[in-house]
């Protein structure tokens, strides 16, 4: 499973403070810790920026700063094309855009960048017009529409990470099964495509969140989820991923599990 580290997000209080003060050491240490925890991508979100020009300047500072200390690709987390392109111009390696959705105008804005820079992209199974669909069938239809537009731009399906959308159980008890149904549908209908989720959304507003997150992770792994946006410094969660991949036949000869044990990464 690919792990997208979620912690470099300026809407988080401590990160926002460090960012405003241009505390390079804090940001770089956060990047290092996530890399050491097992992240394969680092999400970078400049959510404090009110304007596109300001956000572009933020990414111009963040991208080189982070890639100076970790040899990982970044997931450029923004809804605006100008800041995204600023980040992509500075990025070393194959980046990921977070995100596009099923809105036609948004797809026509983002997919040219995906093609131009040869990057990956997270695709939300929603649209700005209709919001988040209430059924797996509607979400699958949006995923298929996105795949059609991607084909027009000759974006490989394997570079698209569809997000079936995790919504909290606290507002609707069926949200977990809805996500899993959509996930299975994407793997069946768009087999070459990847899938991703913002894992911790499932437990928002509920007690013992880590317990729910771990259980949900195993269910999603069993349905074929390829990547997750999560906290890679959460040792218990990362240990659960190692165990889950071994049990589900995704770790040949349990090599990664044994390696994690030898490195002390299962002692959560």
Listing of model-derived features with the role each one plays in the protein:
Residues 1-3, 40-43, 71-75, 94-97, ...:
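Structural preference for beta-strand elements that scaffold enzyme active sites
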Residues 1-17, 25-28, 37, 230-268:
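Extended, intrinsically disordered, low-complexity segments
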């Amino acid at each position: 499973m690919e792990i997208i580290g979620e912690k470099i997000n300026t809407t988080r209080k401590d990160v926002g403070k460090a960012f405003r003060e241009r505390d390079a050491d804090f940001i770089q240490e956060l990047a290092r810790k996530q890399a050491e925890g097992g992240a394969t991508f680092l999400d970078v979100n400049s959510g404090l920026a009110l304007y596109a020009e300001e956000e572009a300047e933020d990414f111009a500072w963040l991208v080189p700063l982070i890639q100076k200390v970790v040899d990982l690709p970044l997931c450029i987390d923004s809804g605006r094309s100008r800041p995204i392109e600023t980040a992509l111009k500075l990025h070393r390696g194959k980046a990921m855009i977070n995100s596009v959705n099923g809105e036609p105008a948004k797809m026509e804005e983002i997919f040219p960048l995906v093609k131009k820079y040869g990057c990956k992209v997270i695709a939300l199974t929603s649209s700005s017009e209709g919001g988040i669909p209430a059924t797996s069938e509607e979400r699958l239809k949006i995923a298929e529409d996105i795949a059609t537009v991607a084909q027009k731009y000759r974006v490989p399906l394997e570079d698209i990470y569809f997000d079936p959308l995790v919504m909290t159980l606290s507002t609707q008890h069926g949200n977990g099964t809805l996500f899993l149904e959509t996930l299975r549908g994407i793997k069946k209908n768009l087999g070459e495509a990847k899938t991703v989720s913002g894992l911790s959304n499932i437990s928002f507003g509920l007690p013992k969140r880590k317990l729910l997150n771990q259980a949900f992770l195993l269910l999603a792994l069993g349905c074929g989820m390829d990547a997750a946006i999560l906290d890679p410094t959460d040792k218990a969660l990362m240990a659960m991923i190692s165990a889950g991949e071994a049990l589900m036949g995704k770790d040949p000869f349990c090599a990664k599990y044994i390696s994690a044990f030898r490195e002390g990464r299962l002692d959560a």
